Design a protein with these regions (language model features):
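Acidic Gly/Asp/Thr-rich repetitive segments characteristic of extracellular carbohydrate-active
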Residues: 25-63
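C-terminal accessory segments
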Residues: 246-303
């Protein structure tokens, strides 16, 4: 992190804001900036936004709108990190996104935590939809065709359902508890990701897997749900037989969690899943780096890539009916 990139002094009406109610949403629309405060600030910023605008959310818990515009929405991260003075942005309801025709390109959601779902629906084709460094219970794509879309550095604590209309959809350096089935009409790539379970009764999993770590079954389902048309390169499974039905595979391995991680691990919202030294050298990806979330072109991190509000100093007294608020903004070096 670059320490204290800049500070913003904001004067707000004393009647309109309290120290304990300082969730902040900033809206950047062209050259114009607006600041909104409180639990409804995300909703208010969204209502004022135009397609392509940027909304930045501070730490805190926010009410959520139903999204129909293509925006860039960036939170402070999905993990509390008190040692570094950073706290998460929490969405307190299911986030529903239904992008309308003409508002479907280049949507970005980054750095938010939700204990419920992200649901992307609609009929319009969605291009370059990106979810980055977020945590959700379940993520579902249904109805819309997604083209060139991406999940990166995410944690999915429940189910990931990419759906039947995905074209060049990639899941990169992410951790997924359960993966739902899809059809051969979808083109999906999992790269340097950890899949803890498969939940597929009717449709087998068909995708390209590269440099991934795969667990076995989920619940009462059987073990291997990889479709024969899947492509597997430099992947490891904890279940012997996971790759048996796959026709195109190279450099596949079987091992156990203790050899790979040093202990028996399941899904976690906080574990970094670092490989043991032996596993790092023994199980190498197509790029010569370690398999799993710390390899590849974009090694795992939970720190948002954009400047974020990490400190808010609020004056205890008003001056001329105004309350002085100092906001400190920091950003990751890369």
């Amino acid at each position: 992190m670059k320490r204290i990139l800049f500070s913003i002094l904001v004067l707000v009406c004393a009647m309109g804001v309290k120290a304990q109610d300082m969730m902040v949403a900033t809206l950047q629309s062209g050259e114009e900036s607006k600041v909104f405060y409180g639990a409804d600030s995300f909703v208010e910023a969204y209502n004022a936004a135009q397609t392509g605008d940027l909304i930045t959310l501070s730490p805190g818990t926010f009410n959520v709108p139903t999204i129909t515009k293509s925006l860039k929405i960036q939170g402070a991260g999905y993990i509390d990190d008190p040692d570094n003075g950073s706290y998460r942005t929490i969405l307190n309801y299911k986030l529903k996104i239904n992008l309308s025709e003409g508002n479907t390109d280049d949507f970005l959601l980054e750095g938010v935590y939700s204990h419920v779902d992200l649901e992307v629906t609609g009929t319009a084709t969605i291009n370059r939809f990106v979810v980055k460094r977020c945590r959700f219970d379940n993520v579902y794509f249904s109805g819309s065709t997604t083209n060139g879309s991406r999940l990166e550095h995410c944690r999915i604590a429940g189910y990931l359902g990419i759906g039947t209309n995905a074209v060049n959809f990639s899941v990169v350096n992410s951790i997924v508890r359960n993966m739902s089935g899809n059809t051969t009409g979808s083109i999906i790539v999992y790269r340097n990701s950890i899949i803890h379970g498969f939940n597929s009764y009717y449709d087998k999993i068909v995708a390209n897997f590269e440099n991934c770590i795969l667990n076995g079954s989920s619940g009462n389902f059987q073990h291997s749900y990889l479709h024969e048309n899947s492509v597997v390169k430099n992947c490891l499974s904890f279940y012997e037989g996971m790759f048996n039905g796959v026709l195109s595979k190279e450099n596949v391995w079987y091992s156990n969690k203790t050899e790979i991680w040093g202990s028996d691990k399941g899904y976690s919202d906080t574990d970094l899943y670092e490989l043991t030294d032996d596993a790092k050298s023994k199980y190498v990806g197509t790029d010569g780096k370690e398999i799993g979330i710390h390899g590849g072109d974009v090694p795992f991190t939970f720190t948002p890539s954009h400047p974020q509000i990490t400190k808010r100093d609020i004056a205890t007294k008003t001056s001329g009916g105004k309350l002085k608020v100092e906001i400190t903004v920091e950003a990751q070096e890369n």
